[in-house]
Amino acid sequence: MEVNEAGRILAGQLGESFSNMEWACRAFKSENHLLRLKAPSTLTMRWLLNVLKSFRENHAKPKIEIASVWMDFDTVDFSREPYDCAILLGNGYFGESTESRLLFSEWLIPVCTPSLLEPARHQLPECDLIHPSPDRRDWKRWLKRTGLFPGLDMGGGIVFDTLEQGSLAAMHGHGVAMADLRLTLDALKSGLLALPFREAIATGDGYYLVWPKNSLRGQSIERLLAWLNLNAPVVPSLDIVCLDFNEKRI
């Protein structure tokens, strides 16, 4: 018996359909066993690795497979990228096909080594400013919101791609960096970094756990979300002046 052209086409279509069914079944069966997570590099190094370590110590399932990547602007395309969920910095909207929950808000504040405290406080225009992004947006936002040092030249300084790189440069005494307050708590507590100013500004963005709507891994994602919320960094009493969008003390 010989299969004709129509039969070969049908066989190919059936083979593709069965492959899709097999993939879906595998995804369903692995619901409680593996969760693939995408996260920004600074957040991963400063907070997430320790939180995931404690998650593994307290939960047998799911296993978390993390990919820490550099992103100029945090995005994820679940239809093209091999992730089940992601932690992204943004305003909470990451597309109509996604769900998201806020973990914590972003607050920016200048940091430097203890030896640079006084020069930074009183002679900031003479100090090297460390920028965690090429567009220098974080220093611009902080200066505008606080009203300090009007007319400060933004043309010079040291430019990096991430908050992590900027913070490391500040730790080595290369200048005054703009940092995320919550992600810098350990360095502040250990004395590696200090706060020349007490004004922290809200950017309006925050770190969100994001996942596709109708995900087959919903239970695992909810379990991870609960643990992330439980271990969100809390700012201690540091006499911080937190400025919201209306520049009011809160």
Protein language model features and the residues they cover:
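Alpha-helical "hinge/linker" immediately C-terminal to small N-terminal DNA-binding modules
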Residues: 1-30
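Hydrophobic residues within well-ordered alpha-helices
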Residues: 7, 78-79, 168-173, 188, ...
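Immediate post-signal peptide segment of exported/extracytoplasmic ligand-binding proteins
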Residues: 29-35, 124-125
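Central regulatory/effector-binding core of bacterial HTH transcription factors
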Residues: 33-94, 243-246, 250
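Short, well-ordered beta-strand segments
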Residues: 36-38, 86, 130, 177, ...
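C-terminal effector-binding regulatory domain of bacterial HTH transcription factors
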Residues: 57, 61, 185-190, 200-250
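Acidic, Gly/Pro-rich loop/turn segments at junctions of secondary structure
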Residues: 67-128, 134-138, 143-151, 157-159
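Hydrophobic hinge/microswitch elements
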Residues: 151-196, 202
